[in-house]
């Protein structure tokens, strides 16, 4: 089917194809044309232009009137924990009362709280709850999403989570990437026996995940009070044996070796980075691993923001993601994430847009097909209400601006 989108005030995030990520100064370029049209065939972008340069084609099956709105590529959210068993607002109050993330975890809250609740829920209940959140983020402009396990912390429950993620991928129009995060914390029954738990992850969980083809990637929480660089290396090596490349939660709580171990294993991304050092930034220059910042986490936990401005100035690419989860970021609103990146990390709007689209896609190994408006890419985009400029999107940080959303050329 041929779909024409016309009457576009600004068509933003365009490229001619072949752009897989943007680094350093390139991130300040978020190309756009005005008074434009775009043609989609069978869910794939085929061409676009300005009406002044070339009239829109007429031999189409359907026309969508953008009504003077801006068309943007859908957000690519490369770090979420959207499958979970319930909210944790009691811990929200604990944080207000001064308890730290680590103190809440030691009291049996945090990740272990979510694991206990998930154990009691059926796969169907988990799926139904997660799909509500998936529909929510689609409506807010997200078109590709990474979803992690990590609230199971035993083999059966980790597999249950990953089967839910697979079902979301099979039944939802959003593009889903699945990541196994059995090493999110030490399961409660392994308290005081972290080495035995790592053995379980390596010898039982990863082979079981691979046998069912349930995950694209393997992630580890490599940070102070969680898993050591040595344990992380062992888990990532086990994943690679089954074709699952690594991703890392690192440098969130302290400079604890996460960046170094990510680079050692050529991890696809290293995420959080609130405690990233100048030495870490220097180590990452010229490497393939995508630094990924999670500004919503810093906002919600009232902790320092990752030094993204330094990273970009050093020539690095940067992605930003929501970290949607019940404990530290109960929101998947990528528009707000973009606003936070501008306000708190001092990114220019264009830099934040690139971090949330093409670089987010790269952090999921999806940028060949997603993350920009380009011929040959999947037609994932949203149409805004008429706005004065694309800078209005992060400026009006709570204003609903999305009018219509499309995934693979189909309106949602």
Model-predicted regions and their roles:
Residues 1-57:
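N-terminal metal-binding scaffold of metallo-dependent hydrolase/deaminase domains
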Residues 4, 61-65, 178, 405:
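Conserved beta-strand scaffold positions in the cores of enzyme catalytic domains, especially
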Residues 8, 38, 43, 68, ...:
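Divalent metal-coordination and catalytic microenvironments
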Residues 19-27, 358, 378-412:
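C-terminal cap of metal-dependent C-N hydrolases
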Residues 63-129:
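Metal-associated gating/positioning segment near the N- to mid-region
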Residues 114-129, 135, 143-256:
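Metal-coordinating catalytic core of metallo-dependent amide/deamination hydrolases
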Residues 245, 255-372, 384-388, 397, ...:
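Active-site-adjacent C-terminal substructures of enzyme catalytic domains
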């Amino acid at each position: 089917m041929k779909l024409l989108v016309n009457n576009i005030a600004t068509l933003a995030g365009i490229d001619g194809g072949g752009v897989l990520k943007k680094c350093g100064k390139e991130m300040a370029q978020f190309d756009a044309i005005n008074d434009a049209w775009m043609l989609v065939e069978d869910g794939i972008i085929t061409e676009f232009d300005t009406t002044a340069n070339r009239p829109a084609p007429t031999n189409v099956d359907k026309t969508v009137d953008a009504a003077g709105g801006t068309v943007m590529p859908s957000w690519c959210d490369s770090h979420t924990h959207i499958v979970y068993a319930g909210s944790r607002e009691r811990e929200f109050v604990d944080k207000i009362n001064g308890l730290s993330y680590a103190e809440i975890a030691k009291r049996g809250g945090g990740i272990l709280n979510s694991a206990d609740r998930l154990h009691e829920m059926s796969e169907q209940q988990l799926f139904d709850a997660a799909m509500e959140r998936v529909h929510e983020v689609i409506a807010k402009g997200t078109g590709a999403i990474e979803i992690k396990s990590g609230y199971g912390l035993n083999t059966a429950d980790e597999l249950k989570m990953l089967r839910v993620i697979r079902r979301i991928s099979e039944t939802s129009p959003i593009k889903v990437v699945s990541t196994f995060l059995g090493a999110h914390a030490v399961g409660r029954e392994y308290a005081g026996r972290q080495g035995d738990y790592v053995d379980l992850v390596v010898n039982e969980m990863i082979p079981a995940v691979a046998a069912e083809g349930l995950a694209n990637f393997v992630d580890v929480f490599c940070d102070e009070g969680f898993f050591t660089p040595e344990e992380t290396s062992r888990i990532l090596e086990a994943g690679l044996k089954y074709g699952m490349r690594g991703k890392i939660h690192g440098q969130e709580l302290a400079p604890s070796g996460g960046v170094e171990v990510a680079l050692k294993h050529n991890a696809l991304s290293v995420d959080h980075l609130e405690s990233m050092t100048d030495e870490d930034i220097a180590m990452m220059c010229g490497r393939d691993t995508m630094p990924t910042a999670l500004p919503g986490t810093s906002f919600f936990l009232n902790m320092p923001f990752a030094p993204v401005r330094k990273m970009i100035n050093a020539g690095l690419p940067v992605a930003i993601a929501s970290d949607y989860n019940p404990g530290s970021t109960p929101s998947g609103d990528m528009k707000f994430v973009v606003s936070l990146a501008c306000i708190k990390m001092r990114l220019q709007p264009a830099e934040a847009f690139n971090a949330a689209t093409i670089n987010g896609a790269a952090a999921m190994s999806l940028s060949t097909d997603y993350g920009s408006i380009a011929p040959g890419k999947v037609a994932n985009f949203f149409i805004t209400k008429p706005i004065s400029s694309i800078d209005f999107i992060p400026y009006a940080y709570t204003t609903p601006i999305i009018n219509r959303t499309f995934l693979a050329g189909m309106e949602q």
